[in-house]
Every structure is written in C-alpha cells, then in structure tokens.
C-alpha cells in the first residue's frame, strides 16, 4: 500500500514538472525570453544598484548604501526643509559615477548656481520646465523608456497641474483630477522604470487635512498612488538653525525613512545642511564617528587615532575639511561598519502613523 502511494507521489511530481516546463515554454513563446524566470537565476533582480544620497548617515539608514535604481522614490516635507537639496546631491553622486541625469522642474524654481555648488555638472544635466502636468509626465515617460537616464527628479508633484485646470477659470472645482493623473502615470511608468534601471525621485509637498480630530492632519499631494508605488519614502524636516555668532548659516535636518521595501524602515537620522554648500559631510563624520567609537570625544576635544581633531564640534569639522585624507579614512571605516551602526546607533522612529500617512505600504 505504501509503495503504491510512493509511486503516485513520484508520478505526480514528474507530471507537475512537465506541466510547469510546458507552461514556461508557452509563456516565453508568447511574450519573449525572460518574461518569466526563477528568481535566483536573475542576477539583476538579486543585486540592487544604488546611488548615494550625499549623506553618509542616510545611506547607512537606507540599509543598502543609498537610494535604489530601477525604483520610485518620494521625498516629502514642509517648505525649505531640504527636499530639492537632497535630490540635487543624489544627482551629483550619480554624475560622479558617469551617470546621465534629468530634472523635470515643474515648479520653475531650480537655482543653477546652488546646484553647481552642490557638485551638479550643469553642462550634462538635462532640464525640462513643462507647462502642464501631462506634459511633465509624458517627458518623464519618454526619458525613462530611452534607457539612457540613471536618475530623474520631478520637482514637484504639487506643481503637476492638470491641463484642464490650467485651461479652466480661477475657482473651478475639479476634484481628484491631479490624483487621477498621478495614478494613471505611475501605472504606466512603473514597468519602464524597472526595465530601464532608472531611479525616479518625486519631490512632494505637505498639505493639511481639514477636520482631523485624531492622528496627524498632514497629507501629501497627488493622492495615494505614489505612496503605494514608491519603494522608498523619506520625510525630511528642519529641526533647528545653525548659527555663527548671530548669523544663521544652516539648518539642522532630520530625515525619517518612513517606507523602505529593501531594508527595515523607520530609521531616523540627523545632519546639517549649510546654506550655499548643502549637506555637511564632515559634520556627519564627527557625529557618526563619536557614536560608533571611531572618533573619540573627551570633554570638548575630538580625536582620531590619538590625533587631536579640535576643541568643539565646529573646530573638529574644520580640521576634517582641511585634511580630506583623514576624513576619507573615517568615512571608509564607518561604511565598513554600516550594518552595526544602523542597528545600534541610528534612531528607530517606530511604525506609528507618521505625517502624511507615511506608514502606508
């Protein structure tokens, strides 16, 4: 009896294998080779290529060393919080690796002088300033489908005004028009983005929901589609000012990874954004170095390998600016221990309902 049962199982197994092979062959004949495969055989899927954000602590918090290519990323936050700065840093890092980047400036507010200061190569940056939301998303789709673009930034979702709204009159009520536009565009874009291995960064603004009694009243523009299609969502906030004597020279910034499909989410980091210079990389090296035990702090003095960097954080930052080889050495050590730093030293904001419905997956 047991032998008959065993033979039946073996026969079923052989039949299933034959049926599966026949089905796979039929799918490949109908839709082309590579339309279906075993996941482990596809090295492109297993190995995720990333681009640095320009912030060491944020790269570590993201868990994969930066923002992923072939995916949609959303950066949102209040006004003047550093959204465009972070996107421009990502473009600069991609260009350093020889990548081609594009910037769809729907807000018509890109400052080329500031972009150059952040390291962006303006001569090789493609820029478009579209008249309507449809035009912006059509340009985005065409560039992505070309397969030649590495990073494409859309600034911002809130400025993607539907054609019907532009051609209409002030005060016309057109509910849900922008949300439908974004939903349709993202359905069309997602497959092309994955195939072309192009990273598309959508910058978004925050709005207030009326009549919310409990929870955060904040939400992002453009409906819910972007929340679902984005592989990474970053909430960026200004939490303080940096002063030299009485003059404000920068912002203290907090970024929370509110959604991450590639690594554990909810990591939270803080760094400085200096006016006219962008993310303070040396400031991050000092702060992360102290947390990880790479840089020693004794009283007000900072030291590395028994070598004094300076008294006070600002003096230590200046020393690293003047001695880039020491800064590179500290950065290399920190990147080598990225997993440990992310696990032990970066704040975990927790999965509570964040601003703008951030925890939606």
From Swiss-Prot:
Could you say what a knockout of this gene produces?
Answer: Greatly increased sensitivity to MMS, decreased bacterial load in BALB/c mice, but bacteria still persist 100 days after peritoneal injection. Increased sensitivity to UV light (but considerably less than expected compared to E.coli), hypersensitivity to MMS, slightly increased sensitivity to H(2)O(2). Loss of mitomycin C-induced expression from a recA promoter. 4-fold less survival in mouse macrophages, where the bacteria has to survive an extremely hostile environment.
The source's domain of life comes to Bacteria
Induction notes from the record: Constitutively expressed at a high level with 2-fold further induction by mitomycin C treatment. Positively autoregulated.
Q: Pfam families, per this entry? A: RecA, RecA_C
Gene Ontology cellular component? cytosol
The entry's keywords: ATP-binding, Cytoplasm, DNA damage, DNA recombination, DNA repair, DNA-binding, Nucleotide-binding, SOS response
Protein's UniProt name: Protein RecA
Q: Origin organism of this chain?
A: Brucella abortus (strain 2308)
């Amino acid at each position: 009896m047991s032998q008959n049962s065993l033979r039946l199982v073996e026969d079923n197994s052989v039949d299933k294998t034959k049926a599966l092979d026949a089905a796979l062959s039929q799918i490949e004949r109908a839709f082309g080779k590579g339309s279906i495969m075993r996941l482990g055989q596809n090295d492109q899927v297993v190995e995720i290529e990333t681009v640095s954000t320009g912030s060491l602590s944020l790269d570590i918090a993201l868990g994969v060393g930066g923002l992923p290519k072939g995916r949609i990323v959303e950066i949102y936050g209040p006004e003047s919080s550093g959204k465009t700065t972070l996107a421009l840093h990502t473009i600069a890092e991609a260009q350093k690796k020889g990548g081609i980047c594009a910037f769809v400036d729907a807000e018509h507010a890109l400052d080329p002088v500031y972009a150059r200061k952040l390291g962006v190569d303006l001569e090789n940056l493609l820029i478009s300033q579209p008249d309507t939301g449809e035009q912006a998303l059509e340009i985005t789709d065409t560039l992505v489908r070309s397969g030649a673009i590495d990073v494409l930034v859309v600034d911002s979702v809130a400025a993607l005004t539907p054609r019907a709204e532009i051609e209409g009159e002030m005060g016309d009520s057109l509910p849900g028009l922008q949300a439908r536009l974004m939903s349709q565009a993202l359905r069309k874009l997602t497959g092309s983005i994955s195939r072309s291995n192009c990273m598309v960064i959508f910058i978004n603004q925050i709005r207030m929901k009326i009549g919310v009694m409990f929870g955060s009243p904040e939400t992002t523009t453009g409906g819910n589609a972007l929340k679902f299609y984005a592989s990474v969502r970053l909430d960026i906030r200004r939490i303080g000012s940096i002063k030299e004597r009485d003059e404000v020279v920068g912002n203290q910034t907090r970024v929370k990874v509110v959604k991450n499909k590639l690594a554990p989410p909810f990591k939270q980091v803080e760094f400085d954004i200096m006016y006219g210079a962008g993310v303070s990389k040396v400031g991050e090296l000092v702060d992360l170095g102290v947390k990880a035990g790479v840089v020693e702090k004794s009283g007000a003095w900072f030291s590395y390998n028994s070598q004094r960097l300076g008294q006070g954080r600002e003096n230590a930052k200046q020393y690293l600016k003047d001695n880039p080889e020491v800064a590179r050495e500290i950065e290399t050590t920190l990147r080598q221990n990225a997993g440990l730093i992310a696990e032990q030293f970066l704040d975990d904001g927790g999965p509570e309902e964040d601003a703008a419905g951030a925890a939606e997956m």
